[in-house]
């Protein structure tokens, strides 16, 4: 199975049918007059959000989509048949962008939401339309108008309430397995997670929220290193970020240093995303002695100058996870209530969301431009001395392509 979250396609709506020039011919009736019908409208192209889809792989290899042309008009005032509409189904959370103008055409965030991306051409007029008291036999018709043609860029951002941040092997996948029914791959090597994973966390009856796990970040991720930078955009629509830190790294590296790396990369990618509400979650507390936990915790808090909520958990042992999920549910409910009661707060969050979207798109566009320079054999000024790339990057035209191999 291949996960694709960015594609470029071209859509062409159907042209309108031409008007018909025809005259009535009947026995014993001279100069029967015009009876040419109008053409049919061209078919339009729509995109519909489908909750059953979770990737844009269907548009990875088929990139040109044409709607049906309207039929020409006929004699006896027959109107041409309209072109059939073309419906393209995409996952919920897909943003449609005009590749030429970079204008955001629409954002499909609800199942069944429908958006027209290309308008079919208007029908041509038959010669009957031009009949008048002074022109009884018009020979004038009009052709159908051409349908819209657009180059589109589709971007998929998963919809989740909570996003997980952390270095590889910080325990993000273990956490999501611990609190939900999702079963992402877990192993003792970096970059086990290659694509975003979603898990639904049920707290009480009729109360639940969605958690998104993305590939781990590494130092230099904001400059294109590793996998996580391209998937950070999936956290743009979350309401809360959980920063997971490994309290007992296997390589005996510094936990405070690891925590600081994530904060720095997040701020470089999008300063506005760094303003999103974020909780610090110290994982793998079962790997260190109980009397050392407080000292390790304080060391990380002091390094980050942290003033927000801090949780010490063990995802694999499910220690502290229940309290954390209940606090998250309470936070989300209070946040929703505040949005409903305080219009100013809602506007503030909407402005923050827009800034995050703009910064994320600008950052990813810069990385795409950089990769295009490499593909053409030219290095940018910022890339001088940077050899951290391989031929696989050259072949990847639409961002990351991840292949799942089942054992």
UniProtKB/Swiss-Prot annotation:
Secreted found in the keyword field: no
Disordered, as annotated region: 127-149, 376-407
This protein's UniProt keywords: Cytoplasm, GTP-binding, Hydrolase, Magnesium, Metal-binding, Nucleotide-binding
InterPro entries xref list: G_OBG (IPR031167), GTP-bd (IPR006073), GTP-bd_Obg/CgtA (IPR014100), GTP1-OBG_CS (IPR006074), GTP1_OBG_dom (IPR006169), GTP1_OBG_dom_sf (IPR036726), OBG_GTPase (IPR045086), P-loop_NTPase (IPR027417)
Presence of the UniProt keyword Cytoplasm in the record: yes
Biased composition (Polar residues): 129-143
GO terms for MF: GTP binding; GTPase activity; magnesium ion binding
HAMAP family: GTPase_Obg (MF_01454)
Name this protein carries in UniProt: GTPase Obg
Protein's organism: Pseudomonas savastanoi pv. phaseolicola (strain 1448A / Race 6) (Pseudomonas syringae pv. phaseolicola (strain 1448A / Race 6))
Lineage: Bacteria, Pseudomonadati, Pseudomonadota, Gammaproteobacteria, Pseudomonadales
